[in-house]
């Protein structure tokens, strides 16, 4: 079923978006198949009136018009629609308007005549209406009003799939009722005045099959104008629900079908001989249907008939002989309850499927027929005029359905849901659904509503509780079972932990192809042979990657081309390096790679925009390495790589073995790739860092820590990391922390040297250290750095 979101919100309007509303509807069991706008995207289209309309002097099929759009002057517009005429209210696209497809309206000349706008058809506005010519608006449409506002076109058509047991939702009222329940909102009740009988005409009813039709209502309405146009609001509501406007009588019955879910039918009173019979077909009877086809009736088919023969297939299809046409003056409205078993399968016997049969065979609210008749009468008198007779009803209380009363045990509810819901909450859910309910001795006794044919057994009530309570609100408890767990080393480092750390550092994970452009790869790794695919997807994807960097740089370029200047990406995956000694002649190595470019931090009013540098990426990598067992043994050793800037590149070494690289992409390569700004990358073997420190708990020292600061002068070539490592090694167990807090070059330091300011924290777990003991540690450190690096204390 397709319905208008705006129409439903007239009944109940929760404070949720369209997307959230669709999610709610789906979780209620009414699966949303699709959502589409009811009109195209356009602006600048207003209600106008054709004040003058004359033939174009140089074109037989064009007309020259003057249109009033509420401005200070009339607009000259050339129109080719055959229905364009004086006095017509139209949809006028004024200068500057933009129609679907980004079609812009400008002043122009057509065959020498000025045209300052465009009179639009439905199709030109992206509105799905089968109509020739331009839109004809009601004569009372206010001139100058925005068409989107006038027709309420900011709306969506939502299509849902219903299971056969939920026929109660085959209407706007039913869907609104469900939305109101889940949002704990009352549904706006439709208020209309029942039309009193103003004439004494009645219709005699001969109910011969009460078991198949326990309730049948007819009403005469005389002197109707079937040529009156259906109001635009009704046509629009029908259109958005997928029903085409035909004439006011048919439109009204279709409107009631959609609004209440009650199928109705209208007969031409002049073509019906009373009494109207409700009976089963007789052998040999035939009926010419409204579509012109002839049905050879079978004896199990319920009919509406008169003394002259069949008038309609009950609850399925009307007959042509009694149908309403343009000459009809008096009509008989029909509203009935047909038993589902009397209709089910009958339409398919004749190759038919109608909106009426679709509802009746699933079940229609048996209390709805009179309300639907009153509503249809009110609409008919409002639109077509006329005089209404009394509502004539024939019914059989014996054969009318009975509302089911079902009991629900607390133990059964808990066992089936695997979750305990408070008693008050369950009772409230039943009340919100419109059910009568009592609770005693851990049992709910529930009486369903007339519109809920599907509530028959205990499990039906459990389903109602679950879907209204919310399937997502029921904990997803895994079943208990005995499992054989695999061995897991405590020292194994989970890759997900590393990914989380990078995401926390404002990186995003990327997944790029293992196939790369050989030209780009040779630019980055000119001395590395690559595997070439014999049958590649394309020339640009014909080589296996020897590094993840080429793919990440492509991702950076992709983002920069889309106005993303700050890019921080990481990727994990295999690189494929040809190796005669490896299995199958290729070494597959799992690596972690990352790339950064742009500013170091996101734009912020309180922060200064600084570009990333080598140490930003190095710091992020060191943070990752701090999670690993060997992170403190990793060294960054200056080394040149083909793809990297010779002055900003280093090899990553663990215990003297190279496990990766880090640095800035070479400027010439950045230029050839089209990258903007400096780009920094690293790549490291995962297996080399895939172990973590196993936590060893120890008591925190309660004795004071002593800090000593040293300013050591060393040669420029001495790495600070090696100096710090030497300090830690020489200081022994009492030296608990070493930190580099300043680097200085300038006055007081000889050229070619630098001053490294280092803090040493000395502490013992068993006693307060004396000055002599502290000085001994400091002396050992000074002696070690003197011997290894010829370090001197700065004056």
Swiss-Prot record:
GO cellular component: a single term: phenylalanine-tRNA ligase complex
Gene3D superfamilies the UniProt entry points to: 3.30.56.10, Bira Bifunctional Protein, Domain 2, Ferrodoxin-fold anticodon-binding domain, Nucleic acid-binding proteins, Phenylalanyl-trna Synthetase, Chain B, domain 3
Record key words, sorted: Aminoacyl-tRNA synthetase, ATP-binding, Cytoplasm, Ligase, Magnesium, Metal-binding, Nucleotide-binding, Protein biosynthesis, RNA-binding, tRNA-binding
A GO molecular-function annotation: tRNA binding
Amino acids binding Mg(2+): 454, 460, 463-464
Domain FDX-ACB residue range list: 701-794
Reaction catalysis annotation: tRNA(Phe) + L-phenylalanine + ATP = L-phenylalanyl-tRNA(Phe) + AMP + diphosphate + H(+)
Organism domain of life: Bacteria
Chain ranges of the tRNA-binding domain: 39-148
Ranges of residues in domain B5: 401-476
PROSITE patterns: B5 (PS51483), FDX_ACB (PS51447), TRBD (PS50886)
Co-factor binding details: Binds 2 magnesium ions per tetramer.
InterPro entries reported in the protein's UniProt record: aa-tRNA-synth_II/BPL/LPL (IPR045864), B3/B4_tRNA-bd (IPR005146), DNA-bd_dom_put_sf (IPR009061), Fdx_antiC-bd (IPR005121), Fdx_antiC-bd_sf (IPR036690), NA-bd_OB-fold (IPR012340), Phe-tRNA-ligase_IIc_bsu (IPR045060), Phe-tRNA-ligase_IIc_bsu_bact (IPR004532)
Xref: PANTHER family: PHENYLALANINE--TRNA LIGASE BETA SUBUNIT, PHENYLALANYL-TRNA SYNTHETASE BETA CHAIN AND LEUCINE-RICH REPEAT-CONTAINING PROTEIN 47
NCBIfam families in the record: pheT_bact (TIGR00472), YtpR (NF045760)
Assembly and interaction partners: Tetramer of two alpha and two beta subunits.
UniProt xrefs under HAMAP family: Phe_tRNA_synth_beta1
Record-given protein name: Phenylalanine--tRNA ligase beta subunit
Organism: Haemophilus influenzae (strain ATCC 51907 / DSM 11121 / KW20 / Rd)
Gene name of this polypeptide: pheT
């Amino acid at each position: 079923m397709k319905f208008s979101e705006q129409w439903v919100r007239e009944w109940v309007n929760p404070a949720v978006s369209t997307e959230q509303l669709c999610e709610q509807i789906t979780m209620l069991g009414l699966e949303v198949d699709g959502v589409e706008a009811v009109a195209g995207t356009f602006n600048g289209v207003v209600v106008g009136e054709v004040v003058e309309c004359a033939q174009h002097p140089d074109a037989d099929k064009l007309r020259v018009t003057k249109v009033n759009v509420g401005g200070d002057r009339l607009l000259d517009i050339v129109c080719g629609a055959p229905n364009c005429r004086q006095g017509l209210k139209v949809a006028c696209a004024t200068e500057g308007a933009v129609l679907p497809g980004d079609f812009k309206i400008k002043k122009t000349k057509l065959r020498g005549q000025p045209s300052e706008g465009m009179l639009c058809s439905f199709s030109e506005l992206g509105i799905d209406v089968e109509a020739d010519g331009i839109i004809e608006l009601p004569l009372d449409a206010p001139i100058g009003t925005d068409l989107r506002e006038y027709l309420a076109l900011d709306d969506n058509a939502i299509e849902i799939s219903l299971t056969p047991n939920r026929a109660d939702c085959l209407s706007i009222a039913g869907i609104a009722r469900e939305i109101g329940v889940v949002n704990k909102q009352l549904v706006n009740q439709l208020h209309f005045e029942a039309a009193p009988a103003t004439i004494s005409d009645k219709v005699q009813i001969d109910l011969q099959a009460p078991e198949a039709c326990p309730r049948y209502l007819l009403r005469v309405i005389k002197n109707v104008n079937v040529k009156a146009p259906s109001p635009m609001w009704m046509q629009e509501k029908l259109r958005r629900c997928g029903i085409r406007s035909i004439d006011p009588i048919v439109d009204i019955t279709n409107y009631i079908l959609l609004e209440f879910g009650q199928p109705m039918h209208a007969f031409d009173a002049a073509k019906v001989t009373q009494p109207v019979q409700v009976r089963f077909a007789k052998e040999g009877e035939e009926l010419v249907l409204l579509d012109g086809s002839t049905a050879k009736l079978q004896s199990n088919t319920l009919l509406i008939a008169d003394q002259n023969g069949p008038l309609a297939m009950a609850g399925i299809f009307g007959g042509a002989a009694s149908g309403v046409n343009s000459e009809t003056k008096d009509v008989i409205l029909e509203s009935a309850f047909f038993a589902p078993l009397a209709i089910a399968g009958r339409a398919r016997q004749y190759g038919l499927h109608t909106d009426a049969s679709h509802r009746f065979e699933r079940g229609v609210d048996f209390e709805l027929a009179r309300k639907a008749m009153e509503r249809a009468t009110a609409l008919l008198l409002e639109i077509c005029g006329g005089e209404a007779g009394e509502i004539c009803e024939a019914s059989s209380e014996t054969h009318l359905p009975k509302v089911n009363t079902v009991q629900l045990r607390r133990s059964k509810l808990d066992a089936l849901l695997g979750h305990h819901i408070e008693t008050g909450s369950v009772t409230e859910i039943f009340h919100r659904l419109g059910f009568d309910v009592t609770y005693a001795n851990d049992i709910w006794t529930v009486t369903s509503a007339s519109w809920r044919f599907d509530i028959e057994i205990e499990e039906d009530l459990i389903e109602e509780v679950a879907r209204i309570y919310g399937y997502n609100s029921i904990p997803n408890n895994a079943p208990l079972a005995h499992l054989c767990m695999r061995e897991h080393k405590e020292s194994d480092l989970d890759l997900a932990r590393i990914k989380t750390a990078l995401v926390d550092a404002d990186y995003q994970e990327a997944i790029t192809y293992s196939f790369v452009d050989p030209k780009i790869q040779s630019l980055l790794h000119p001395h590395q042979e690559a595997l070439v695919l014999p049958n590649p997807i394309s020339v640009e994807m014909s080589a296996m990657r020897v590094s993840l960097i080429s793919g990440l740089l492509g991702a950076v370029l992709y983002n920069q081309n889309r106005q993303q200047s700050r890019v921080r990406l990481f990727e994990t995956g295999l690189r494929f390096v040809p190796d005669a000694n490896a299995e199958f002649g290729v070494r597959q190595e799992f690596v972690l790679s990352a790339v950064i470019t742009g500013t170091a931090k996101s734009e912020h009013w309180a922060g200064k925009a600084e570009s990333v540098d080598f140490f930003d990426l190095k710091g992020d990598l060191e943070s990752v390495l701090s999670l690993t067992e060997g992170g403190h043994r990793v060294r960054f050793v200056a080394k040149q790589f083909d793809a990297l800037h010779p002055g900003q590149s280093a090899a990553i070494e663990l215990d003297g073995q190279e496990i990766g690289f880090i640095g800035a992409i070479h400027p010439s390569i950045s230029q050839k790739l089209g990258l903007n700004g400096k780009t920094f990358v690293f790549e490291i073997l995962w297996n080399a860092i895939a172990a973590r420190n196993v936590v060893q708990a120890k008591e925190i020292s309660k004795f004071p820590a002593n800090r000593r600061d040293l300013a050591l002068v060393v040669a420029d070539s001495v790495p600070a990391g090696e100096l710090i490592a030497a300090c830690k090694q020489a200081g022994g167990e009492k030296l608990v922390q070493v930190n580099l807090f300043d680097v200085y070059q300038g006055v007081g330091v000889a050229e070619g040297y630098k001053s490294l300011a280092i803090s040493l924290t000395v502490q013992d777990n068993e006693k307060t250290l004396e000055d002599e003991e502290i000085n001994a540690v400091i002396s050992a450190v000074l002696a070690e750095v003197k011997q290894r690096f010829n370090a001197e204390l700065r004056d």
